């Protein structure tokens, strides 16, 4: 148990650091697409690693499989340490906002000049109401995401009477939809809303509510239609799952992008934990109607929490709330 906890602890270091690099090297009006591509890494890795490690474990034992996974992670980390630089100025380049003539990026670069790291963390993360709104929204989005991932195959088995393999294949469509949805959300927030994540977040949150409602209120006896519903739900869930983290980085101080992303990420995993035992109790008492009611309510409230972000977002500090 201790080793698993340490494994998760060190894995958690990756995302905030990547968020900091993405906010440093890409400007506001292009960041969504690149952030979306980075966000698909866990989908691609989640698909490839079981095949690579599974084959190694089958032929050489489970210890070898785990060592291969760890070895690949170490090699990738060493390569990144060798090739990555913390900011453009390190290699003699101007700040990315100046290079791209991005007004909102320039505003974020100039925000809070001269503050200490403690003042930045306090003002732009811990006491920033917009970060707290995004954190609460992340809890609800992850309730929906983890609920479909954890309970979707059981729902398919009980409602359609299909075997577990067939049920899991439908849940796979949820991940596939999420892969595409994250790319569309990132690209759309750049091209359609000029780097404002609020409108796209709200559109996708409304889509979560509609797609969850289609699974709940219009149950299809056809496996194909159920799989299509899982696909659309994944498409809309993974948009906010990606955009909320990026919005947190952009609503904070540029020097606190990693801290802001890590802070909202903490609440995301709180939401994932709520889809375990608490949701199991809901299913025991109110069955699948209760299950879908809970995640539909979560989707609806998440949409309401995103309403303050409809306007274009410069850095948000406490005194702007």
Predicted regions, residues:
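Helix-loop-helix hairpin linking two adjacent transmembrane segments in secondary transporters
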Residues: 38, 42-91
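Helix-to-loop junctions at the C-terminal end of transmembrane segments
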Residues: 183-195, 283-284
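Cytoplasmic membrane-interface "Motif A"-like loop-to-helix N-cap segments
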Residues: 191-205
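C-terminal ends and interior cores of transmembrane alpha-helices
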Residues: 206-220
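A late C-terminal transmembrane helix in Major Facilitator Superfamily
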Residues: 254-285
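Extracytoplasmic gate region of multi-pass secondary transporters
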Residues: 128-183, 241, 275-276
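Juxtamembrane intracellular "pre-TM" segments in multi-pass secondary transporters
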Residues: 91-133
């Amino acid at each position: 148990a201790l080793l698993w906890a340490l494994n998760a602890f060190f894995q958690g270091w990756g995302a905030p650091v990547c968020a900091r690099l993405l906010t440093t090297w890409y400007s506001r009006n292009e960041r969504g697409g690149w952030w979306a591509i980075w966000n698909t890494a866990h989908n691609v890795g989640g698909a490839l690693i079981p095949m690579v490690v599974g084959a190694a474990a089958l032929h050489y034992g489970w210890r070898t499989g785990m060592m291969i996974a760890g070895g690949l992670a170490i090699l990738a980390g060493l390569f990144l340490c060798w090739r990555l630089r913390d900011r453009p100025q390190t290699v003699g380049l101007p700040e990315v906002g100046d290079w791209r003539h991005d007004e909102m990026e320039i505003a974020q670069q100039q925000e809070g000049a001269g503050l200490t790291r403690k003042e930045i963390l306090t003002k732009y993360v811990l006491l920033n109401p917009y970060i707290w709104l995004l954190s609460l929204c992340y809890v609800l989005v992850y309730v929906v995401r983890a609920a479909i991932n954890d309970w979707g195959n059981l729902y398919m088995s009980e409602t359609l009477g299909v075997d577990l393999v067939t049920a899991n294949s439908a849940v796979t469509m949820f991940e596939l939809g999420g892969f595409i949805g994250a790319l569309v959300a990132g690209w759309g927030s750049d091209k359609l809303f000029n780097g404002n994540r609020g409108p796209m977040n709200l559109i996708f949150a409304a889509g979560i509510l509609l797609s969850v409602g289609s699974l709940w209120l219009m149950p299809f006896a056809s496996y194909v239609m159920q799989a299509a519903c899982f696909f659309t739900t994944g498409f809309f869930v993974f948009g906010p799952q990606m955009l909320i983290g990026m919005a947190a980085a952009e609503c904070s101080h540029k020097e606190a992008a990693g801290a802001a992303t890590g802070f909202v990420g903490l609440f995301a995993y709180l939401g994932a934990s709520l889809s375990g035992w608490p949701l199991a109790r809901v299913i025991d008492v109110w069955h699948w109607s209760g299950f879908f009611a809970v995640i539909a309510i979560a989707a609806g409230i998440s949409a309401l929490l995103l309403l303050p972000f409809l306007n274009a977002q410069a850095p948000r500090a406490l005194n702007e709330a």
